[in-house]
């Protein structure tokens, strides 16, 4: 096989490499022979994705790749990869990545401050994405980037202009910010004349701001050449009207994609399909995609029926009404990806989607939650990846668990929100679920007495584990019991208030698996014990 691969032209191999991440390329092709190693060492288009990566793959990439070979980099200090950015910065200096074009920072421990202050040196950087953990550091200078994405925590709000207000943003063409105040909204529109796509959640707290939003084009310069616009708007109840949006949208004659989510109560006239049709035909001639989700409370089928006109059906802009969530939305774009055991069939009275396409409502579901007293599901969810059991009497539903292999072949995440006493071997006869790679046990630490249960028999291939604990010994037990575990997140159970103090050295001394690790950085851990206790662990494969 290596001899046959040697006949491949280098140009073809480089084209193949362009479809894979750096760790995938190195894992597949490194050390096949000297010829391939020379190709790998000369390749200069590596895209590194360290999000949720295996520790061994992280080490492989850091060992073999030089900074000047990298054009894209993703760093993440998430639960699955604690202390990653710190490890990375002990090996590399970001300013050495002279060919870097795209950078994504995900929940870094210092929110990226140590890296962001040096990005102005990377003159080839055109795309920057930051997922903030706590706060966005002050960014004084950036190269002339074209794409800027800032994802903020949902429970943290601040004026983003404090961090990026002094930046020159004239070259930005694509902007996405989780949320912004109306003042920040005005700032971005004024400072980005070349903007082509914009996505944000906008808070209009006062009726005056709603009016200013509508008349923004008369107040200041705006990027009327927008091609893609995605807005989530929260405003005082019943303040937003069709007229406001007609004034706001009319200048965007080149708009091709439009997504609109409204979170506040609306007048029924806002849901009038005829009005939206008139607005689009007269002022948005290039619009190809229109997705929306509006709060709605109505019993009249007339509102749905207006969306059955040839205009909507010919464009395949189908809508549906969900009486439980009280939402009117486009499908399949906003069709739910999660469901509980109380799912009901979708009536044609409440959707314009053709009957033969109703399977979309079930095929899009990738998370299924079983509640107590679960009855059989009337539908087969072939694409479910996450399965959640919220049932204190787990053994009543083991028959459903045993069907996972055949009925839900895509499931790889399982959450068992039930007491340990419900998890006994006699309730799991001959069940083995090697497809489960991510396991969550939120009540594992609820009881102190030892429960005899063969976890490795039922879940032999778990790689990512989340569990509550009530002692240090439970952490060691779980690390050593799940032989294939690559990362773990352990949190002190809410019913146990005993302080847990633990160190990296203690873990290595008491865990048989970690004790066998010879490399100094063979595993990484982040211990948080200031107020409560949690431990993030990132390990190499068990040898």
State what each model feature region is:
Residues 1-543:
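Eukaryote-biased activation of long, low-complexity terminal tails and linkers
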């Amino acid at each position: 096989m290596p001899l046959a691969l040697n006949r491949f032209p280098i140009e073809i191999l480089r084209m193949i490499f362009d479809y894979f991440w750096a760790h995938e390329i190195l894992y597949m092709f490194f050390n096949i022979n000297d010829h391939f190693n020379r190709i790998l060492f000369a390749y200069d288009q590596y895209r590194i994705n360290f999000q949720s990566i295996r520790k061994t793959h992280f080490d492989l990439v850091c060992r073999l790749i030089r900074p000047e070979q990298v054009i894209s980099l993703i760093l993440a200090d998430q639960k699955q990869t604690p202390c990653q950015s710190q490890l990375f910065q002990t090996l590399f200096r970001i300013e050495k990545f002279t060919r870097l074009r795209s950078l994504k920072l995900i929940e870094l421990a210092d929110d990226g401050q140590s890296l962001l202050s040096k990005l102005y040196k990377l003159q080839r950087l055109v795309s920057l994405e930051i997922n903030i953990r706590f706060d966005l550091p002050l960014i004084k200078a950036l190269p002339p980037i074209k794409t800027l994405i800032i994802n903020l925590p949902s429970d943290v709000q601040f004026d983003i202009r404090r961090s990026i207000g002094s930046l020159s943003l004239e070259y930005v063409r694509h902007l996405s910010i989780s949320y912004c105040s109306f003042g920040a909204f005005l700032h971005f529109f004024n400072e980005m004349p070349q903007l082509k796509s914009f996505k944000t959640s906008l808070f209009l707290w006062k009726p005056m701001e709603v009016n200013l939003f509508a008349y923004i084009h008369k107040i200041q310069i705006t990027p009327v050449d927008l091609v893609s616009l995605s807005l989530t708007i929260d405003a005082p109840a019943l303040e937003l009207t069709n007229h406001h949006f007609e004034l706001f949208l009319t200048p965007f004659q080149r708009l091709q994609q439009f997504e609109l989510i409204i979170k506040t109560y609306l007048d029924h006239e806002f849901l009038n399909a005829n009005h939206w049709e008139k607005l689009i035909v007269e002022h948005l001639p290039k619009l190809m995609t229109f997705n929306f989700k509006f709060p709605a409370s109505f019993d009249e089928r007339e509102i749905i029926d207006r969306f059955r006109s040839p205009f909507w059906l010919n464009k395949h802009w189908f809508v549906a009404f969900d009486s439980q969530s009280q939402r009117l939305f486009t499908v399949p774009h906003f069709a739910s990806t999660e469901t509980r055991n109380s799912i009901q069939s979708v009536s044609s009275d409440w959707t314009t989607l053709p009957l033969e396409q109703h399977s979309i409502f079930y095929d899009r579901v990738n998370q299924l939650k079983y509640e107590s007293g679960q009855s059989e599901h009337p539908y087969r969810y072939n694409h479910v990846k996450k399965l959640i059991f919220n049932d204190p009497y787990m053994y009543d539903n083991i028959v459903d668990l045993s069907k996972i292999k055949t009925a839900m072949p895509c499931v790889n995440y399982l959450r068992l929100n039930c007491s340990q006493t419900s998890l006994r071997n006699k309730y799991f006869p001959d069940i083995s679920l090697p497809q489960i790679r991510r396991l969550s046990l939120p009540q594992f630490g609820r009881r102190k007495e030892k429960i005899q249960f063969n976890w490795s028999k039922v879940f032999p291939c778990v790689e990512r584990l989340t569990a509550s604990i009530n002692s240090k010994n439970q952490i060691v037990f779980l690390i050593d019991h799940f032989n294939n575990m690559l990362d773990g997140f352990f949190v002190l159970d809410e019913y146990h208030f005993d302080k847990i103090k633990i160190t990296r050295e203690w873990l290595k001394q008491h865990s048989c698996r970690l004790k066998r690790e010879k490399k100094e950085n063979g595993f990484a851990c982040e211990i948080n014990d200031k107020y409560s206790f949690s431990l993030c662990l990132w390990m190499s494969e068990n040898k």
